[in-house]
Amino acid sequence: MRILVIGSGAREHALLRGLSTDPATTELHVAPGNAGLGSIATVHPGIKADDPEAVTALAKELNSDLVVIGPEIPLVAGVADALRAAGIAVFGPNKDAARIEGSKAFAKDVMAAQGVRTAHAEAITPGASSEDIDAAIDRFGPTWVVKDDGLAAGKGVVVTPDRAAARAHVDAVLEGGNPVLLESFLDGPEVSLFCLVDGETVVPLLPAQDHKRAYDNDEGPNTGGMGAYAPLPWLPEDGVQRIVDEVCVPVAREMVARGCAYSGLLYAGIAWGAEGPAVVEFNCRFGDPETQAVLALLKTPLAVLLNAVATGTLAEQPALEWEDAYALTVVLASYNYPEAPRTGDVIRNADADNVLHAGTALNAEGELVSAGGRVLNVIGVGETLEAARDNAYTTIKDIELEGSHYRSDIALAALEGRISI
């Protein structure tokens, strides 16, 4: 298969690595890519990922058998629709189905129709009076959850015990032109479960846990994700199946009923409380950085699997096979991420096999430099969670990037038995 991957981050690097080991893969291309992907795929840097016409033209030019879309923005922009209209197999949902991430209000409506457990929510639209906003905020708390009802790269959510901070985020989102969703706070540890979905066929991958806050001990602002690990030693034995049965299958069924059948990767962000799983959010694509850990453990050929989803034959595939191990991702972020990341700093000692590229580029001198907030990912795999952590942190400590930072506590709470249900 000739495969084109759309995106430019470490998630796409992980997808390319997985696809490259599948004997069914004959050619790999990526657009727009980054500075670390040239050794594994042909990079097409001039292509805008969210331009349906440009992506479709490239796929036709390359005679692609399969296009795999990594990020959410191209999906919400209708890139998958354009590819399908051109007769090209694509892994990723159509624009209508991508609303499961693009509109939190739409996701709430889908869940309500199927009785899926989630937080109570209330929308505030641009133009609402100050008095109405205050009244809505007073109906929630004392821990406020304020969400930008649009795409925010994982950084549009504020969870705070401070009413003034909650109001400030409401105002900021409304001033940006998007509605706001206020939600009740869901207690319990979070689970990221990726499911391959082909209509009403749902196949779960390994459960993972993301670390959203910028700094150790879950301090600092929300980010796109600073690290993740898989699987979850603290999740009940029936945990994955409960999420599939109580969340993902009902949602897939509802999408079919609404005429926007889902085809691609459905990411369920779950809070596991006293009554079991409740939905925090849905994403319409592989999560970043959880994907990097999950795919490191997948033994089943990835190209064949994604193509089965794209061609409507997922139900015919054999059960997935996994390594009996743990995997962990640690993100190396640039100076002042996530507020105003500095770019252009030279990166050294990043040549290890377990390093994935995200925000990287080459400068005029041909040096590897930072080109985004999340710059590199380091993957650790081991028979135990402790061994996986050791492998990742041994590598990341040697990488040089001025002003960079990373969390030193990825999976530490799980390792020390501090997560309980």
Curated annotation (Swiss-Prot):
It comes from the Bacteria. Belongs to the GARS family. GO terms for molecular function: ATP binding; metal ion binding; phosphoribosylamine-glycine ligase activity. Mg(2+) binds at residues 281, 283. Pfam families: GARS_A (PF01071), GARS_C (PF02843), GARS_N (PF02844). SUPFAM superfamilies: Glutathione synthetase ATP-binding domain-like, PreATP-grasp domain, Rudiment single hybrid motif. Binds 1 Mg(2+) or Mn(2+) ion per subunit. Disulfide bonds: none annotated. Its cofactor is Mg(2+); Mn(2+). Its EC number is 6.3.4.13. Signal peptide: none annotated. ATP binds at residues 137-192. This is Phosphoribosylamine--glycine ligase.
